[in-house]
């Protein structure tokens, strides 16, 4: 008789445990699902989460609910300081994904003998969530990059070909970042790959310190190696569809455009942003004739993604470029050739404000 009481009590405790972890898993899935729905607008991410939540709900039988006893739960209401430090959507997603995965593992272990169907479902969902979590975090990263891109008014393009001194390069870029520049593109046409990698790594670290976007010109392999925020490609570089396959969906992809046909093609192919120019004559694009302010005006009428006027732009010409319709500009010499790159950057930003 005593053995039967002990067995019944053990089953009741396991039922309580299963009830709590079903609640925990479903609640965590709902948190993730709602961010994918309202925060990311991604129905492809919402659908599996909703399906998993419904399947767990169907297996949340009344016998588990009847075993619930919140009043006697010794850990009810127990908190942890880490719970108050989740200040971003990715942090909340990571925490809730871990919560769900842990709950599902508990359901597997304790459900094998009591409820094999539930244990099997929990295992399937747990492995599915491992992969889906990565996709969701990638989508969060892309969204964050997109928001920062839309907020950027001034893009600094480096010019290490003029000066092979890494210390001076970093000094100029850091000065610009201190002034508020939030987008840096690393561009080097000369030199070797070892040199490029060293410079790109140093610039990526510097940009991360200031929470600025870091874009690599031309080189997708280099961008991936240093974990850059994206790549900028010229008209003679890879088609955007092939570039996207290599780069992945979470990073930014830019394209240089010199006429309306280029702009429309780039947008159709999924460019995240555009370079529009060269507006004026520039030493960095000697092979291209200036497109002039008329091209800026035309771009302003057709561009559906963020775009930067580029080419020979400095503090003297910005007013005319803005009057032609540009809200964002990219510069090289106006900052990198200045005796005071921080002040030059600050003045440019004030003019664009």
From Swiss-Prot:
Single GO molecular function: magnesium ion binding
Catalyzed reactions: 2-[(2R,5Z)-2-carboxy-4-methylthiazol-5(2H)-ylidene]ethyl phosphate + 4-amino-2-methyl-5-(diphosphooxymethyl)pyrimidine + 2 H(+) = thiamine phosphate + CO2 + diphosphate; 2-(2-carboxy-4-methylthiazol-5-yl)ethyl phosphate + 4-amino-2-methyl-5-(diphosphooxymethyl)pyrimidine + 2 H(+) = thiamine phosphate + CO2 + diphosphate; 4-methyl-5-(2-phosphooxyethyl)-thiazole + 4-amino-2-methyl-5-(diphosphooxymethyl)pyrimidine + H(+) = thiamine phosphate + diphosphate
Needed co-factor(s): Mg(2+)
Gene3D superfamilies on file: Aldolase class I
Binding-site residues, 4-amino-2-methyl-5-(diphosphooxymethyl)pyrimidine: 185-189, 217, 256, 285
Record keywords: Magnesium, Metal-binding, Thiamine biosynthesis, Transferase
Statement: the UniProt record of this protein carries the keyword Metal-binding: yes
Cofactor remark: Binds 1 Mg(2+) ion per subunit.
Domain of life: Bacteria
Sequence positions that bind Mg(2+): 218, 237
UniProt cross-references to InterPro entries, sorted A to Z: Aldolase_TIM (IPR013785), ThiamineP_synth_sf (IPR036206), ThiamineP_synth_TenI (IPR022998), ThiD2 (IPR041397), TMP_synthase (IPR034291), TMP_synthase_cyanobac_bac (IPR016229)
Pathway: Cofactor biosynthesis; thiamine diphosphate biosynthesis; thiamine phosphate from 4-amino-2-methyl-5-diphosphomethylpyrimidine and 4-methyl-5-(2-phosphoethyl)-thiazole: step 1/1
Residues annotated to bind 2-[(2R,5Z)-2-carboxy-4-methylthiazol-5(2H)-ylidene]ethyl phosphate: 282-284, 312
Pfam family, one: TMP-TENI
GO biological process, alphabetically ordered: thiamine biosynthetic process; thiamine diphosphate biosynthetic process
Function: Condenses 4-methyl-5-(beta-hydroxyethyl)thiazole monophosphate (THZ-P) and 2-methyl-4-amino-5-hydroxymethyl pyrimidine pyrophosphate (HMP-PP) to form thiamine monophosphate (TMP).
Family: Belongs to the thiamine-phosphate synthase family.
Name recorded for this polypeptide: Thiamine-phosphate synthase
Originating organism: Synechococcus sp. (strain CC9311)
Name of the gene this protein is made from: thiE
């Amino acid at each position: 008789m005593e053995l039967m009481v002990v067995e019944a009590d053990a089953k009741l405790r396991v039922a309580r445990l299963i009830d709590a972890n079903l609640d925990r898993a479903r609640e965590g899935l709902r948190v993730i699902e709602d961010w994918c729905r309202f925060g990311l607008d991604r129905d492809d991410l919402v659908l599996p989460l909703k399906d998993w939540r419904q399947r767990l709900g169907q297996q949340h039988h009344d016998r588990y609910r009847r075993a619930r006893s919140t009043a006697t739960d010794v850990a009810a209401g127990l908190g942890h300081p880490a719970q108050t430090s989740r200040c971003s959507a990715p942090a909340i997603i990571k925490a809730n994904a871990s919560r769900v995965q842990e709950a599902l593992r508990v359901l597997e272990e304790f459900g094998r003998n009591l409820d094999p169907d539930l244990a099997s479902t929990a295992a399937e969902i747990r492995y599915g969530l491992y992969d889906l979590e990565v996709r969701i975090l990638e989508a969060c990263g892309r969204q964050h990059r997109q928001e920062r891109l839309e907020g950027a008014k001034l893009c600094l393009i480096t010019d290490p070909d003029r000066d092979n001194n890494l210390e001076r390069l970093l000094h100029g870029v850091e000065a610009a970042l201190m002034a508020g520049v939030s987008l840096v593109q690393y561009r080097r046409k000369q030199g070797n790959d070892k040199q490029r990698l060293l410079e790109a790594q140093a610039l990526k670290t510097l940009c991360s310190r200031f929470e600025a976007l870091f874009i690599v010109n031309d080189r997708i392999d280099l961008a991936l190696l240093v974990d850059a925020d994206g790549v900028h490609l010229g008209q003679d570089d890879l088609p955007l569809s092939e570039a996207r396959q290599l780069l992945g969906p979470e990073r930014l992809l830019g394209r240089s455009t010199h006429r309306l046909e280029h702009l429309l093609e780039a947008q159709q192919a999924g460019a995240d942003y555009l370079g529009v120019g060269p507006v004026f004559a520039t030493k960095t694009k000697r092979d291209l004739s200036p497109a002039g302010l008329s091209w800026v005006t035309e771009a302003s009428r057709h561009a559906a993604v963020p775009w930067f006027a580029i080419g020979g732009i400095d503090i003297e010409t910005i007013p005319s470029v803005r009057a032609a319709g540009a809200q964002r500009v990219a510069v090289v010499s106006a900052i990198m050739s200045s005796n005071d790159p921080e002040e030059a950057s600050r003045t440019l930003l004030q003019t664009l404000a």
